[in-house]
UniProtKB/Swiss-Prot annotation:
Enzyme Commission number, as recorded: 2.7.1.24
GO CC, alphabetical: cytoplasm
DPCK domain location: 5-202
Major location (coarse): cytoplasm
Cellular location(s): Cytoplasm
Name of the molecule in the record: Dephospho-CoA kinase
Organism: Xanthomonas axonopodis pv. citri (strain 306)
Residues that, per the record, bind ATP: A13, S14, G15, K16, S17, A18
Top-level EC class as recorded in UniProt: transferase
Keywords recorded for this protein, A-Z: ATP-binding, Coenzyme A biosynthesis, Cytoplasm, Kinase, Nucleotide-binding, Transferase
Pathway, per record: Cofactor biosynthesis; coenzyme A biosynthesis; CoA from (R)-pantothenate: step 5/5
High-level lineage: Bacteria, Pseudomonadati, Pseudomonadota, Gammaproteobacteria, Lysobacterales
Length: 202
């Protein structure tokens, strides 16, 4: 059971997953909000609520969520994005906390892409530390176009739909700057791991 929980966040295409993987190599359990969000949106009451609000156009023929269609809708419209978050986020938060507390390890990391947007510690009071992966906006843009095949316009919308770098940095206890050098991420993870282990067992 992990009583010490670190929230890991950063903008889209910032390298959160790469940093999380470095912590996993060190034996730290990582709970991924994106994975939990997909589980929450499987057929059931949350998906029913999504379909009731957005219509059947966000469903595939087999009744599962058409993630691409929904993503396009919510990135294009702030009100629709907020509506989706109101439907899904309470369930995601509950499951994240449950999974983090149940994790076996020296401490647990919970990767939460929209931590700043959700209100930081005010919304996640059970986080002991907040770790932000920071990346220049130009590099985010480039990664989205290369990694996800996003157009320049969609990449712009995806970045501006999220909190600003300044807002994310304002909630950070620790910051890792990711310029795409894996060795630097690995070194940062080892340094922070030693600190978090000490904090988890004072």
């Amino acid at each position: 059971m992990s009583d010490f929980i670190v929230g890991l966040t950063g903008g889209i295409a910032s390298g959160k997953s790469a940093l999380a993987a470095e912590f996993e190599k060190l034996g730290v359990p990582v709970i991924d909000a994106d994975v939990i969000a997909r589980q929450v949106a499987e057929p059931g009451p949350i998906l029913d609520a999504i379909a009731a609000y957005f219509g059947d156009s966000v469903l595939l023929p087999d009744g599962t969520l058409n993630r691409q269609a929904l993503r396009y809708r919510v990135f294009a419209d702030t009100a629709q994005r907020q509506a989706l978050e109101a439907i899904t986020h309470p369930a995601i938060r509950r499951e994240l906390q449950r999974a983090a507390l149940a994790a076996q390890g020296p401490y647990a990391i919970v990767a939460i892409p929209l931590l700043a947007e959700a209100g930081g510690r005010a919304t996640y009071p059970w986080l002991d530390r907040i770790l932000v992966v920071d990346v220049p906006v130009a590099l985010q843009h480039e990664r989205l176009m290369q990694r996800d095949g996003a157009t320049a316009e969609l990449a712009d919308r995806m970045i501006t739909a999220q909190a600003t770098r300044e807002k994310r940095l304002a909630i950070a206890d620790e910051v890792v700057c990711n310029h795409g050098v894996l060795k630097q991420l690995s070194q940062a993870a080892r340094r922070l791991d030693a600190d978090y282990r000490a904090r988890a067992n004072p």
